[in-house]
Amino acid sequence: TLSEGFSALFAVMLYRGEYNRRPLFPERSAGYGAILRYTVPITFTAIAMPVSQLAESIVAANLLRSAGLEATALYGIFSGCAVTIINLPVSVTYGFAAASVPKIAPLASSGDVQSARAAALKAILITLGVAIPFSIALYVFAPLAADIIFRSLTAEQNALLVRLVRIMSINAVTLSLTQTASACLTALGTPVRATAVQWVTCALRVGLAALFISRGFSVEGVAIASNIAYFVAAAVNLWYIIKVKANSNALKSKRRSV
């Protein structure tokens, strides 16, 4: 709470510093409708993950308990240990998602859709170039990471953690791609699509987790469900970007022919 409070205070100070600077030319102020068009979808996108994690924890814990397993311990190793390790490289690539927005949004707002899409695809390629080595490293060095970060685990718990990290190592790629592609869709002026994909992904993740646990996959089923959900999210986001680019090029060709 304190860290978030200091972060918010620092952001306000930076904003006030920028606000007090007088621009060389008068700027047109954005209306409330234009602001809400972006802030509302972004807000719903941000709350999708916590809501899905809460739902997943309830569903997974109850199903694991009904199967006669140690629900709290098993899901705790997944959410508290495996996800923590996976999120370390994902947090690095989050910077690419944040940095891509200021470069893509002006191009999209000016009508240069082709350049905006090219910038989006470039950001995605950079994300891939960083995430793939991280994914390989997670798979190869999962035992070492488990020993260093979570030394208090028993041998059986450590072995489970290593299996979960190796299963979810692909998430370093798919989750990173989902973040960057979602940010690119928002910058391209289609934040509602990014929000819809995020909520569908979360629902798919919870549903698949319940299915796999009921089929006897135990907590590994939650990890597999996460892999499938984020792969679908990354693929759909990329498809949206490529599809819109193709539609834009087709529209330009039609206008030229007219």
Name each model feature, range by range:
Residues 12-46, 244-258:
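Interhelical loop/hinge segments that connect adjacent transmembrane helices in multipass membrane
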Residues 154-181:
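Alpha-helical transmembrane segments of multi-pass membrane proteins
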Residues 1-9, 192, 202-235, 242, ...:
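Membrane-interface helix-loop junctions in multi-pass transport and translocation proteins
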Residues 133-155:
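Short membrane-interface helical motifs at transmembrane helix boundaries
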Residues 172-200:
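Membrane-interface junctions at transmembrane-helix termini in multi-pass inner-membrane proteins
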Residues 47-88, 106, 146-154:
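Helix-terminus/linker motif at the lipid-water interface of multi-pass membrane proteins
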Residues 90-110:
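Helix-loop junctions and terminal segments of transmembrane helices
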Residues 32-36, 79, 112-129, 133-141, ...:
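Interfacial transmembrane-helix starts/ends
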